[in-house]
Amino acid sequence: MSRVAKKPIALPSGVNVTINGNNVALKGPKGQLSYDLHADVEVSQEGNTLQLAPRNGDASKYAMAGTMRALVNNMVVGVSQGFERKLELVGVGYRAQAQGKTLNLTLGFSHPVAYPVPEGITIETPSQTEILVKGVDKQVVGQVAAEIRAFRPPEPYKGKGVKYANEQIIRKEAKKK
């Protein structure tokens, strides 16, 4: 039985919830999100908390209720605080520059890489070797960060490439003669 689904979701002040059947819509200071819950999960609001429960007590339905609770909790955190992912560029001549809705990357290719920023995401470049991806939806923020990293993933010999700020690159030793 899911222990995650039993825990209620606390709604911070400034976050409004609209429940319409299986659709949960959240509106907060950072933005708004909505999600269609699984048919086997029901949601109820009691004061400033949300409670998710399976429709009938099957084990797989409890697991689904736990998953839905985690997704709704991420939505609450997103509309109240937002999510951010930090990337670092390691390598000689590797640079990033945010211009409007485009991120221009110089990653050692014969051409610069222009990445169009999706809707609902803001990208900042505090320095030429740092990229901050910010947004309301945790999944989209992670996806955008992964797509930027995929242009030049860190290589194991010198560690050059685009890496997450907290990522440890496992190094290999160069071949000896």
From Swiss-Prot:
InterPro entries: Ribosomal_uL6-like, Ribosomal_uL6-like_a/b-dom_sf, Ribosomal_uL6_a/b-dom, Ribosomal_uL6_bac-type, Ribosomal_uL6_CS. It holds the Pfam family Ribosomal_L6. Keywords: Ribonucleoprotein, Ribosomal protein, RNA-binding, rRNA-binding. It comes from the Bacteria. One of its GO terms (cellular component) is cytosolic large ribosomal subunit. Part of the 50S ribosomal subunit. Belongs to the universal ribosomal protein uL6 family. This protein binds to the 23S rRNA, and is important in its secondary structure. It is located near the subunit interface in the base of the L7/L12 stalk, and near the tRNA binding site of the peptidyltransferase center. NCBIfam families: L6_bact. This is Large ribosomal subunit protein uL6. It comes from Thioalkalivibrio sulfidiphilus (strain HL-EbGR7). The gene is rplF.
